[in-house]
Regions:
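Residues within well-ordered alpha-helical secondary structure of globular protein domains
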Residues: 131, 150, 225, 260-263, ...
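Low-complexity, acidic/Ser/Thr- and charged residue-rich accessory regions of DNA metabolism proteins
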Residues: 18, 32, 297-302, 307, ...
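Assembly/interface hotspot detector across virion components, adhesins/toxins, and nucleic-acid enzymes
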Residues: 155-157, 162-165, 178-182, 194
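Noncatalytic, basic helical substrate-engagement surface that gates or grips nucleic-acid strands
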Residues: 1-138, 144-163, 310-311, 316-328
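Helix-hairpin-helix
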Residues: 144-145, 170-300, 309, 315
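Glycine-centered flexibility motif
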Residues: 35, 160, 183, 225-226, ...
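Short, surface-exposed amphipathic charged segments that create phosphate/polyanion-binding patches used
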Residues: 128-132, 166-176
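Charged/polar, solvent-exposed surface patches and flexible loops
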Residues: 12, 38, 42, 46, ...
Length: 351
């Protein structure tokens, strides 16, 4: 089975197709989707003989992923917290809405479009790759390295190179463990060593905000049950900064620009203390289980990251629905001549 990471290819073609180079929006949209669809068709045809049918793994377009329900700060770092100009995002949303109208048409082709409520494309690929046949994952996402085995290969659409399990230096399980320990900054997943103890800045903020002392037990409950407190902390500090430098409502846009350039989130006082000795003891320790048994924060943080990063821990409800959707999928056979003509797809190659 050829398993295409839709989101990556979509983002690449979107970035390489600047709207301002087209005379009108309709021409722009048509050309963007023409390039995208022809790329899918090319991949499906090139690797069919070796890997079989092609599945397009599509993220839930509402972005209500199960990981966000499990950990509210998941991918929160991808939001623009400062910009007041949403024009660029609206263009993207417009394109995404247009794409949703194409998915039903693809059901009349050899490509299987699959989208499951609450799931990301990674989840779909991880679940379908468990079936006992050869698989080719089409993506540059390094998270898929954990899935490599004798039946699963990875094709980089960027370089055209195929990676197999034997090409990986070192143990895949060791690479996975290191990933869990250190988190994934691109997805907003912190290392297991973060948020063990509050910084002085966070403790003072909490006491001022809630008129009570931040005890060890309260901090543990806060970080494990309502991690969104991190955003509240940052928001209050940013607002205090703005008030202190005397910006007014009519200077919002100017302030936003200054803030984005001069006061990055990285410069906000951390909400937790950095403890390098803890990291050294975990990564160099002979019996990690004993260390975790004595430290409830490390234990919780490790299990949290394992659930978010390790694709063996995809939500069980998602797993069932992916399998059901794939097994009950039925291709349709409507007329797609107009569709192929519009997007310049040879009909013989997509049917």
């Amino acid at each position: 089975m050829v398993l295409i990471d839709f989101r990556y290819l979509f983002n690449v073609e979107y970035a390489l197709t600047p709207k301002d180079e087209y005379p009108d929006y309709e021409t722009y949209e048509t050309d963007l989707f023409s390039k995208l669809l022809n790329r899918f068709v090319s991949i499906a045809n090139e690797y069919y003989s070796s890997y079989g049918k092609c599945v397009l793994a599509i993220d839930d377009h509402t972005k209500r992923y199960w990981r966000k329900a499990f950990y509210p700060l998941y991918k929160i770092n991808r939001l623009n917290l400062f910009s007041l100009d949403d024009k660029k995002n609206n263009i993207s949303d417009e394109i995404e809405q247009a794409w949703l109208k194409i998915i039903p048409i693809l059901r009349n082709t050899k490509i299987v479009p699959l989208e499951i409520s609450g799931a990301e494309g990674d989840d779909l690929i991880a679940v379908l790759a468990k079936s006992p046949e050869r698989h080719l994952i089409v993506s540059v996402d390094k998270d898929f390295i954990q899935l490599l085995d004798e039946n699963i290969d990875i094709l980089s659409p960027k370089t055209g190179e195929i990676t197999r399990a034997e090409d990986i230096n070192g143990s895949i399980s060791a690479i996975m463990d290191d990933h869990i320990l250190n988190g994934d900054a691109s997805d907003g997943i912190p290392s297991i060593y973060a948020y063990r103890k509050p910084s002085d800045s966070f403790s003072l903020w909490f006491k001022k905000k809630f008129k009570t002392k931040l005890t060890e037990d309260v901090y543990f409950r806060l970080m494990t049950q309502t991690p969104e407190a991190e955003l509240l902390y940052k928001s209050d500090i940013l607002n205090e900064y703005r008030d202190n430098i005397g910006f007014y409502n009519d200077s919002e846009t100017f302030f936003s620009t200054i803030l984005e350039r001069e006061l990055s989130v990285k410069r906000i006082p951390l909400s937790y203390k950095i403890e390098r000795n803890v990291k050294n003891s975990v990564e160099n320790g002979f019996d990690r289980s004993k260390i975790f048994a004595k430290d409830k924060f490390l234990s919780y943080n490790y299990r949290r990251n394992q659930r978010l990063i390790d694709l063996r821990y995809v939500d069980t409800n998602i797993v069932k629905r992916v399998i059901s959707a794939f097994e009950t999928y039925r291709r349709e056979y409507g007329d797609i001549k107009a569709f192929c003509s519009k997007y310049q797809i040879p009909i013989s190659e997509i049917k």
